[in-house]
């Protein structure tokens, strides 16, 4: 016969488990809006923590002044590109607005449409009918798509608002993390040690190294390439160079490099008979591309003694899997997995493996 106490214990266990799951799910829903901002703040603070300590030392040990200085730097780093982007979009849209608002819109005749086999004449006749109707027929044709266009702009406005919210949260969390960095670091290490007394602290150290390697080897390299490319575009007279600069940053972050933006700019210069500037920009583009292969491994080695290929693989995979925040998540996960496998093969802890690697690198 089953003991009633065992039944009570089982019931209590099930109810406790349900309660814990419910509390955990509710807590996740509460903190979900803040996760992205906190994640970005964590990555930024980890990457720039040595810079903050140097600034604090330079300012005579005043943490508050150093934290304010770092927040101002972050504001400039994020706001200046946004201002450039908005300015470029405004400059691009002004001619279109004037064109649409003018009363004498002149559409091209598109006579070449008649030369298209089979369907060319029919398309040309339909196009001429639209032009002859003074725009009324054209409006009726595009009216079904107006709802989708409006919905698209509403979604983009919502995304813009979310971006500003996450940017504000990122700055607030960065301020808190800079101010209480040591306490938070000790708490994370204690938590990691509770999970694994053998490898906990070493895994935290690996995560920090991976984040700094990405920040230096990928992000800093992308910014340097974008600035150099922007200088070349500005001097050669390519329009909307600020917008192209921002596109180059994203292209470099996803490991495509600056050439997908620079090569079309070179072609545009040649197309407009600016052969001298086109040739100079082509030479400058090759220089910037070669510089990428020199700076990236160098900066990754400064950030940590980790395999360059593993970092870059983590960056690309993380971006595809998690979006922009995956830029840091991917390398961290791959580096930890790599070190766990290597330490398991050699039968030593990650901490011992890291010590041996550090000693070898110092002796070399």
UniProtKB/Swiss-Prot annotation:
GO CC, any one term: plasma membrane
Record lineage: Bacteria, Pseudomonadati, Pseudomonadota, Gammaproteobacteria, Enterobacterales
Xref: InterPro entries: AI-2E-like
Transmembrane segments: 18-38, 40-60, 65-85, 161-181, 215-235, 243-263, 280-300, 309-329, 331-351
NCBIfam families according to UniProt: PRK10983.1
Coiled-coil parts of chain: none
Presence of the UniProt keyword Transmembrane in the record: yes
Keyword tags: Cell membrane, Membrane, Transmembrane, Transmembrane helix, Transport
Protein name: Putative transport protein BUsg_115
Record's keyword annotation contains Cell membrane: yes
Organism per entry: Buchnera aphidicola subsp. Schizaphis graminum (strain Sg)
Its membrane topology: Multi-pass membrane protein
Family from the record: Belongs to the autoinducer-2 exporter (AI-2E) (TC 2.A.86) family.
Subcellular location(s) of the protein: Cell membrane
Source domain of life: Bacteria
Main localization of the protein described in the UniProt heading: membrane
């Amino acid at each position: 016969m089953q003991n009633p106490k065992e039944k009570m214990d089982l019931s209590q266990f099930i109810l406790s488990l349900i309660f814990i799951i419910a509390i955990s799910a509710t807590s996740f829903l509460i903190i979900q809006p803040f996760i992205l901002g906190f994640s970005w703040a964590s990555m930024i603070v980890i990457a720039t923590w040595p810079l903050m300590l140097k600034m604090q030392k330079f300012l005579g040990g005043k943490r508050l002044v150093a934290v304010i200085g770092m927040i101002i730097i972050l504001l400039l780093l994020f706001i200046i590109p946004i201002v450039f982007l908005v300015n470029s979009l405004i400059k691009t849209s002004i001619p279109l607005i004037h064109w649409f608002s003018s009363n004498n819109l002149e559409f091209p005749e598109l006579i070449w449409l008649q030369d298209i086999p089979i369907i060319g004449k029919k398309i040309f006749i339909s196009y001429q009918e639209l032009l002859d109707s003074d725009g009324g027929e054209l409006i009726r044709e595009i009216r079904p798509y107006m709802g989708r266009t409006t919905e698209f702009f509403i979604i983009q406005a919502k995304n813009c608002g979310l971006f500003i919210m996450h940017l504000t949260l990122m700055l607030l969390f960065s301020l808190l993390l800079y101010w209480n960095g040591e306490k938070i670091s000790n708490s994370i290490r204690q938590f990691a040690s509770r999970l694994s007394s053998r490898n906990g602290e070493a895994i935290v150290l690996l995560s920090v190294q991976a984040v700094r390697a990405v920040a230096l080897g990928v992000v800093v390299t992308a910014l340097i390439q974008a600035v150099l490319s922007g200088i070349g575009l500005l001097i050669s007279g390519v329009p909307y160079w600020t917008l192209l600069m921002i596109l180059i940053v994203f292209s470099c972050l996803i490991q495509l490099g600056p050439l997908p933006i620079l090569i079309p700019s070179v072609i545009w210069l040649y197309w407009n008979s600016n052969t001298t500037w086109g040739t100079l920009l082509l030479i400058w583009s090759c220089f910037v591309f070669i510089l990428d292969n020199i700076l990236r491994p160098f900066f990754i080695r400064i950030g940590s003694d980790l395999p360059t290929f593993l970092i870059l693989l983590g960056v690309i995979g993380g971006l595809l899997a998690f979006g922009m925040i995956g830029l840091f998540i991917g390398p961290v996960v791959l580096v930890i997995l790599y070190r766990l496998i290597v330490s398991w093969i050699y039968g030593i802890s990650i901490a011992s493996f890291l010590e041996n690697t550090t000693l070898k690198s110092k002796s070399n």
